[in-house]
Every structure is written in structure tokens, then in C-alpha cells.
């Protein structure tokens, strides 16, 4: 029997890191549009480079994709998804950090097909996000943000 295209593919594991960036209760989102084939609101994230710690990757990617210099407050968790390329099946794990920005400034990275960026209230951000796994991460991160805020710890960097 012939192998199906799916069975013929190599499975590749990839790791990315990203941030749920919050300023004054609002969440930073990016709008991606790749040649009109892919569009939607996403959280900033990207691939781990050699020798990088996950937190470093998350902070670097947030800065590269949005122009925002954020502080990593705490690790939120990971999401996983699978996608197909021409030759492989890629299993991607994304490690997420709750981050704090120091202003509403953001500038989407055009080279990565980001056309827009901005800070949105939780319920807006939740509904705008294209991927359910990113919605779940947002939910978890925002809950932790609320708890830190109630405890008087949000915005007080010396606690972390």
C-alpha cells in the first residue's frame, strides 16, 4: 500500500514564546494579514533562538513585533498546536508570559505582515483573537493580572 502524504511527512517539534502584554488593564494585540490568505488578531510571539531562555525570547519577540519594551511579570503556561507545511507536520509549543507595558505605544512590524496593533479591553481582546488556544491563554493571564492587582502587586516590579 502507498503511504498517504500525511504519513510520509516528518514530524518536527518547534518552540515559540510570547507575551500577554497589559497596560492599564488593556491587552496588546497584533493584526496579521499575509497576502490576504491569513488574517486575524493574535498575541505577539516568535521562535526561540539558539542559547536563548524562554523569557528572553518572549521579551525580544514582543519588542520586535510591536515595538513595546515590556517587563515579564510571570510565566502563564503553554499552548500547543499542529500545522502542515509542504513536507512536514510541525508540532509547535508556545510558552507564554504575563507582561506589563509602560505606555499604550505600539508599532506593528510590517516585515512580519502585521498591519495593525493596539490595546483592547479584555472582552474585546477575547473576541478579537483568532485562535481558541490564544483565547485560553489570555483568560489565564488576565485572571492572574486581576489577582496581582487585587494584592497590590501589579506595577511593583520589585516583587518579581
For each feature predicted by the language model, list its residue ranges.
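Acidic, Ala/Val/Gly-enriched low-complexity intrinsically disordered segments
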Residues: 2-8
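Unchanged
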Residues: 48-136
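A generic structural signal for ordered secondary structure
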Residues: 18, 26-28, 55, 75, ...
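Charged phosphate-binding loop/patch that engages nucleotide di/tri-phosphates or the phosphate backbone
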Residues: 130-160
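N-terminal strand-loop-strand
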Residues: 8-43
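Functional cleft and adjacent loop/helix regions within the main domain
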Residues: 44, 50, 159
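Classical N-terminal secretory signal peptides
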Residues: 1-2, 160
